[in-house]
Swiss-Prot record:
It comes from Equine herpesvirus 1 (strain Ab4p). The keyword Phosphoprotein applies. This is Nuclear phosphoprotein UL3 homolog. InterPro entries: Herpes_UL3. Belongs to the alphaherpesvirinae HHV-1 UL3 family. GO terms for cellular component: host cell nucleus. Keywords: Host nucleus, Phosphoprotein.
Length: 212
């Protein structure tokens, strides 16, 4: 039976008889460390293929101007109010007024978004004695009007006019405390965009050709 050293020598391992300190011979037999020239590659790096996630690739060419399907807007007004009892009626009135008085302009109006903290107020009321004052809830409405910057002044003036001309209700009531309050203020915020935002014409109030 061949010895292990003979087998290793047959495999190409450097084998010799150790007569001196073992550490010195082990250091001599240690294979050289790989250098930059001992490991080479002939394959060329393959560039990463990043999918095109641009608007053009997902939804086709982005509209760069007025066309048959899209309208561009760069100005937005937000109509906001807190604790407005007739919030739906108020925004419906604004929307109808803008449609009539601004018939020569192309605009877009969103539906009214309403937020309320009444549910949390009711939970607090169940855990509080009736003698303690309950924190009143806040109801908020938000409606957005989009237009072009060239028409922003007319839109702004008309929004202020229709809000100031609203008929005050007999009373305004907060749902949590039941007390009456004066007319609730309505706020108008104006935003301008650097790039136009395009909406489909199905969601736009088109300008009346006869009013132009």
């Amino acid at each position: 039976m061949e010895s292990a050293l003979t087998v290793l020598s047959g495999w190409g391992w450097p084998v010799e008889v150790v007569t001196g300190p073992v550490a010195d011979h082990l250091t001599e037999m240690r294979p050289p460390a790989p250098t930059g020239t001992t490991c080479t590659t002939t394959s060329t790096p393959t560039p990463l293929c990043v999918p095109d996630l641009s608007v053009e690739s997902i939804k086709g060419l982005a509209p760069d101007g007025e066309n048959a399907n899209y309208v561009g807007f760069d100005t937005m007004f937000m109509v906001s109010s807190i604790d407005e009892l007739g919030r739906r009626q108020l925004t419906d009135t604004i929307r109808k007024d803008l449609r009539v008085t601004l018939a020569k302009f192309t605009i877009a109006c969103t539906k009214t978004s309403s937020f309320s903290s009444a549910s949390s107020t009711r939970r607090r009321k169940r855990h509080c004695p009736s003698s303690e004052r309950v924190m009143r809830s806040n109801k908020s409405l938000q409606m957005f009007v989009l237009c072009r910057r060239a028409h922003a002044k007319q839109i702004r003036d008309q929004l202020q006019s229709v809000i100031q001309a609203r008929k005050p209700r007999k009373y305004y009531t907060r749902s949590s405390d039941g007390r009456t309050h004066p007319v609730v203020p309505v706020y108008i915020y104006e935003f301008s965009a650097v790039d136009k935002v395009y909406l489909h014409r199905d969601n736009v109030i088109e300008a009346d050709a006869q009013a132009k």
